[in-house]
């Protein structure tokens, strides 16, 4: 029996032996049955991997009894074909899974690139992370290289997604810190109190800031910032007053107020507004009447007009007002507002024309530089005659300097004011 089986196997491999010729008829019938069984197994193996025993008996039903060894051979071939078909089916399934997961991974990557904000971790919801373990378990050695490349690419995409998520989370976390702070809306009472405190002291101490914060119901930092801005505003106003004498803002305020009172300005002068906000359009009758009656279409300012604390009393240095009394003696500085200088000169001329000669005293430097009793005390009834129209030498004219302007005098009524010593 063993010898016949070996001869049949050798005959199938192509080695014809004399023993094989004796059983040629048997081998032909067995070979045909084996070929038909193999063909049927190849065609039906993809649909039904393991054929039933009834189909095998039907296939080999016509073989004689002494040829039962072909059944074992047939089962051997059937098992081999079954293993090959199962491996093909598993390879096809892995191919389909691989293509499906690769497409899903590509779509997920495109969705992540197109989406603005990523919510959650991308590795938990991307199928590429799940497909890595399944591909390692199911793929054969043929797809090992492809699987490793796809794993590395998917891991790289996961890493980039994680970096993107962390950056987006960081941006969202730093967003509330970058909220724009809106400006504080102060009431009139708060601004008036702060302005009053600023006139008293430009730099406020911290305990005083705490008191103001409690009184005005404002944060301490808001009051601190307000004082900083107010100091800068005051500095800008002082720098903007380039005419006529920026070293003495009280003199500037007095001159402009006097010009507004005489009618040279079409509306009342506010000392806290810089000079270039007042375009001089000339003196009109309506403006003069409005200045005389005090009626003005403009509302009163929130804070008082004595910004430099100079309007509460007449000017403390009357010896410097010769430019108002005699505008021809003082030329306007170069590069300054010529229209303002012209308007001030016109106002001074109008004031001089309206005042009779000899009735109002003139105490300017040029008028009293040659007077013998200029430095001594004078009474309210003693008046000096102005010598501005008289002939004077160049040496007798003494213009005031910055050192003279920086000096301050005591506040007193005009009739009780004493002449202060002047240095040339």
From Swiss-Prot:
Protein localization: Nucleus
The UniProt record lists the keyword Endoplasmic reticulum: no
DNA-binding region, residues: 179-238
Compositional bias ranges of the Polar residues kind: 50-65, 132-145
Region (Disordered): 18-65, 132-178
Record's compositionally biased regions (Low complexity): 146-175
Signal peptide: none
InterPro entries, per the entry: Even-skipped_HD (IPR052002), HD (IPR001356), HD_metazoa (IPR020479), Homeobox_CS (IPR017970), Homeodomain-like_sf (IPR009057)
Sorted UniProt keywords: Developmental protein, DNA-binding, Homeobox, Nucleus
GO molecular function: DNA-binding transcription factor activity, RNA polymerase II-specific; RNA polymerase II cis-regulatory region sequence-specific DNA binding
One GO CC term on file: nucleus
Family to which the UniProt record says this protein belongs: Belongs to the even-skipped homeobox family.
Matching PANTHER family: HOMEOBOX EVEN-SKIPPED HOMOLOG PROTEIN 2, SEGMENTATION PROTEIN EVEN-SKIPPED
Name the UniProt record assigns to this protein: Homeobox even-skipped homolog protein 2
Species of the source: Heterodontus francisci
């Amino acid at each position: 029996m063993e010898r016949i089986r070996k001869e049949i196997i050798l005959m199938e491999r192509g080695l014809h032996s004399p023993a094989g010729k004796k059983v040629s008829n048997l081998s032909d019938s067995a070979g045909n049955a084996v070929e038909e069984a193999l063909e049927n197994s190849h065609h039906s193996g993809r649909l039904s991997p393991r054929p039933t025993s009834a189909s095998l008996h039907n296939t080999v039903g016509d073989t004689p009894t002494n040829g039962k060894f072909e059944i074992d051979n047939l089962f051997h071939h059937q098992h081999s074909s079954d293993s090959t078909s199962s491996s093909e089916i598993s390879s096809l399934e892995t191919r389909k899974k691989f293509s499906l997961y690769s497409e899903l991974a590509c779509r997920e990557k495109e969705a992540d690139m197109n989406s603005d904000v990523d919510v959650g971790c991308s590795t938990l919801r991307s199928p590429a992370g799940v497909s890595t373990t399944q591909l390692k378990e199911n793929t054969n050695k043929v797809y090992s290289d492809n699987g490793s490349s796809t794993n590395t690419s998917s891991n790289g995409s996961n890493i980039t997604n994680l970096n993107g998520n962390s950056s987006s989370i960081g941006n969202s976390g730093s967003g509330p810190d970058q909220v724009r702070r809106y400006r504080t809306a102060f009431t009139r009472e708060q601004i008036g109190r702060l302005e009053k405190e600023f006139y008293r002291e430009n730099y406020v101490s911290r305990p005083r800031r705490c008191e103001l914060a409690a009184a005005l119901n404002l944060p301490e930092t808001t009051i601190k910032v307000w004082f900083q801005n107010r100091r800068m505003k005051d500095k800008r106003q002082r720098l903007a007053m380039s005419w006529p004498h920026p070293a003495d803002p009280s003199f500037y305020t007095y001159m402009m107020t006097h010009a507004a009172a005489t009618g040279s300005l079409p509306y009342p002068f506010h000392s806290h507004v810089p000079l270039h906000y007042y375009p001089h359009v000339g003196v009109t009758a309506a403006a003069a009447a409005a200045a005389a009656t005090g009626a003005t279409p403009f509302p009163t300012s929130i804070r008082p007009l004595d910004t430099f604390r100079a309007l509460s009393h007449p000017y403390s240095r009357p010896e410097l007002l010769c430019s108002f009394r005699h505008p021809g003696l003082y030329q306007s500085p170069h590069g300054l507002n010529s229209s303002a200088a012209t308007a001030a000169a016109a106002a001074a001329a109008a004031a001089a024309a309206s005042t009779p000669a000899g009735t109002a005293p003139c105490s300017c430097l040029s008028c009293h530089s040659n007077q013998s009793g200029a430095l001594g005390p004078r009474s309210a009834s003693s008046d000096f005659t102005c010598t501005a129209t008289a002939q004077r030498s160049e040496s007798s004219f003494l213009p005031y300097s910055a050192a003279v302007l920086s000096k301050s005098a005591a506040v007193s009524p005009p009739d009780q004011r004493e002449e202060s010593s002047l240095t040339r």
